[in-house]
Amino acid sequence: MEDEKIIGLYWERSEDAIAETASKYGRLFFRIADNILSDQEDSEECVNDTYLGLWNAIPDARPSPFAAFAGRITLNLALKKYEYRSAA
C-alpha cells in the first residue's frame, strides 16, 4: 500500500493503518531498534510503541516521507530505552 493511503488510514483512525504499517515497515522498525538494543523483547516493544506514537502523531501531521518519520520515532524510542537500561 502507498504511504499516502496509510497516512489516510491514520487520519480516518482506522486500525488497518497499524496493520498496513506493520506489513510494510515492521521489519525495518525492528532492525532499527535491534541494532541499538540487541534484545528481541525490547526491540519488539519499541516497534509496538512506534505504532502507538504514529497513531498519536499523525492526526496533527501529514509526514513526508512517512518511512523516515516513523523510523525516527523508532530510533528515539530505542535510544531512550537504551539510556534507561544503561543508567540502571
Label each PLM-derived region with a short phrase.
Residues 1-8:
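Intrinsic, short, N-terminal disordered tails of RNA polymerase sigma-factor systems
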Residues 11-12, 48-66, 84-86:
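Sigma70-family region 2
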Residues 11-20, 30-49:
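Short, charged helix-capping/linker segments at alpha-helix termini
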Residues 21, 25, 29, 50, ...:
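Residue-level preference for hydrophobic side chains embedded in well-ordered alpha helices
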Residues 75-88:
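Arg/Lys-rich amphipathic alpha helix in sigma70-family domain 2
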